[in-house]
Amino acid sequence: MYKACFAAVALSSAIVSTGLHAETIKPVKVSKAELAGAIFNRNDAVKKDDGGHRSTDVVTFTSPDNAYQTGVYKSGPLHEDIEGPQGLPYSEFLYFLSGSVKLTSSDGSVMVVNTGEAVTLPKGWTGQFDTQGYTKLYVTYDADEAKKQ
């Protein structure tokens, strides 16, 4: 009995001490200066020029299961058709720091989202995405990514 109790205490101590020495999870902050544009000068900024469409993306957080992601994205002028049976492959929340976007859903309804406004595009949305350029904070979620883990 004594040995069993000692083993239980030793195991509990090992579990607790392991937990105490695990990496601390901390919040991820983006400063005002970064949101004003400095974030796009970071080494991890991904800059693209795809057929004249220029964009810069800085991912600020990705969950361990890859299902949830946040970041700051800057786009030049763009027209994009989001089509097909699957539509948008993930849900996305967008908050516009500058610029605007015109969203035309597949039923023809139109929504304009301006600087200081936000919109959520549900997974599966289809339509047209038109802009003269913008900078956004974004959050994406894709439950299918979590299922892959």
What does each model-identified segment do?
Residues 8-15:
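Bacterial N-terminal signal peptides
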Residues 123-146:
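Ligand-binding loop in jelly-roll beta-barrel domains
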Residues 107-123:
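Short acidic-glycine-tyrosine-enriched beta hairpin
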Residues 19-69:
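A short, N-terminal "cap"/entry segment at the start of jelly-roll beta-barrel domains
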Residues 1-7:
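Bacterial N-terminal signal peptides that target proteins for export
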Residues 82, 103, 136-139:
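Short hydrophobic/aromatic-rich beta-strand segments that constitute the beta-sheet cores
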Residues 88-103:
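Short, conserved beta-strand element in jelly-roll/cupin
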Residues 69-88, 122-123:
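Conserved short histidine dyad/triad with adjacent acidic residue
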